Amino acid sequence: MFSYYVHLAIRSLRRNPVLTTLMVLSIAIGIGATMTTLTVFHILSGDPLPGRSRQIFIPQLDPRPDNQPGQHPFDKLDYTTAMDLRRARRADRQAVVVDSQVKLRAPETGRPALMLQMLSTDADFFPMFQVPLAYGSAWSARDDEDRARVAVISADLNDTLFGGSDSVGRSLLVRGSAVRIVGVLGRWRPSPQFYTLAGGGFAHGDTAEFYARPQDVFMPLSTSLEVNGDHFQPWTCFAKPSMPLNLPSAPCVWLQLWVQLETPAKVAGYRRFLADYAAQQKASGRIGRSDTAVLLSLPQWLDHNRVVPGDVRLQSWLALAFLGLCLFNTVGLLLAKFLRRGGEIGVRRALGASRRAIVAQCLTEAGLIGLVGGTLGWLLTLLGLWALRQQPVAYADLAHLDVWTFAGTFLMALACSVAAGLFPAFRASRIAPAMQLKTL
């Protein structure tokens, strides 16, 4: 019976190609615009560490000695707090992180010096965040302690300097200091760049830079303080620092500490440790209040920083509203089309067709329109994502169609077209056969 409905639907659509084209275009444009924006929203709001994000936590503690009730802790830690928590080693893995600019060159390539982004961190950073390595390995905890002059570089920098070949063992000059490459990252593009997130709560939706590519150079924090320490910048200072600025002793926050806690018991234990540490620091007079100590999971941290850019959220709502307008137009066109066929429907009802059969026939026709519109909408989605990749935004390279989007495009098109056809189909099924037969 379904094949018969499809045959009738195709004949009906061919009978009025202009009206059919208008309905298909209405569905296609609405689906294309909506799926383009929803694809971007889906990518930007995804889990940057699938399967592990709920084991990753970031501690916060306000170091201000004059902190007042109602003040929230900074998104970063001061040097004393970060080092105290790091030395305690209460987590399964832990890593202090701070990013900065760095000037480097590869002497053997003869290329001019480059100004790049560097992440200073600890050896646990790589296994904790499941960072893939194409060549070599990360440095060891012993390298952290020994302030070893070693580095891991990104795949992009390896392509630029060494043509993508295995560069392990080669040297870089970082601020004039020789540093040996021990590893090269594989293709790694966390979305967002969660491990440096800060300040999203007061960014007013301007968070596109949270989706920037990973840093080009990774070095032990202990080494970076020697090699590039003069070029670290404070995130914010809660008192006037002395000059020249010495960040490790300055009243400034500029570091983040990430910890991995694999069980709920370990999470509870770390929270107790953090509370005890805060109480101890308050008793010593270093901080003003101890109740600012909190431990946030990675998903909570993403929510805290409101990572999805405000313009992407707005575009998603506008696209959904536009889709609603397109569906409203489709409802009107389908209603006009079905009511125009009142004579045909009246004859079918007089010959014994049930109202359910009429509804099924009309919905099959609406579904066929949705299928064609979905195919065209999928092509428009591809075009929209291509156009987005040409834009100068940090997340432009992430805009690609995935399986979810591909399937969602057709499911949404079918669902929307069938939903748009419900009211016209119901009205068509209520046509009185006797009244239509009198007009024949």
Give the ranges of each region predicted by the language model.
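Generic structural signal for small/hydrophobic residues in well-ordered secondary structure
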Residues: 13-16, 35, 44, 58-59, ...
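Short, strongly hydrophobic transmembrane alpha-helices
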Residues: 16-49
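C-terminal membrane-exit region of the final transmembrane helix in multipass inner-membrane proteins
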Residues: 408-440
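Structured, solvent-exposed hinge/loop segments at the ends of secondary-structure elements
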Residues: 38-161, 165, 174-179, 190-193, ...
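Intracellular coupling helices
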Residues: 6-18, 328-364, 368-369, 430-439
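Mid-to-C-terminal secondary-structure elements
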Residues: 123-138, 149-306
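Membrane-helix entry/capping segments
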Residues: 1-4, 10-11, 15, 19, ...
